[in-house]
Amino acid sequence: MCIRDRPPARSIGEDVGGLYEIWNTEATPFTTKGFEDKADIDIELEPSKGGTKFRYFQINPTPEGVPVEILNEMAADAFDKIKASHCRVDVSKHPAMHKTDSIDYIILLKGDVTLILDEDEIDLKPFDTVVQRGTNHAWRNNGNEPALFIAVLIDSEIDA
């Protein structure tokens, strides 16, 4: 049964990229009854305790010539809007570095992207898959067009 056949009810941050919520679960076990849009809630980066998030997201190319201080302010504002300021634990390698208490399954659908980690950088091409296990990371769009990803985030207890 198809519950919804339309664009996502909520999105945020289109000026720097954007998060587009497809579906959320709040905790397990979850009910399969009802027809309400589980993604029609305020957008937060992390899933709730015991919950999941299914979304696609877009990373726009970094504007040329913008000072790093301004990029840091833009990133801080973007993370604040999605209740994720606490996820920015070490931004020394990139203004959008962040770490969530989740395991994330991510597929790059379109674009030329580098995954930036604390100790490494990995170039990705369309249909490459990344499994994030509570790692501090950021995405750098190396192209001239927005990069598009699809992701499933699952709340997890991350080892320190």
Tell where the protein language model's regions lie, with residue ranges.
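Conserved small/polar residues in nucleotide/adenosyl-binding loops
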Residues: M1-R6
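Short, well-structured hydrophobic secondary-structure segments
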Residues: P7-N60
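Ligand-binding loop in jelly-roll beta-barrel domains
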Residues: T52, E121, K125, G134-I158
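Conserved short histidine dyad/triad with adjacent acidic residue
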Residues: K53-T100, G134-N136
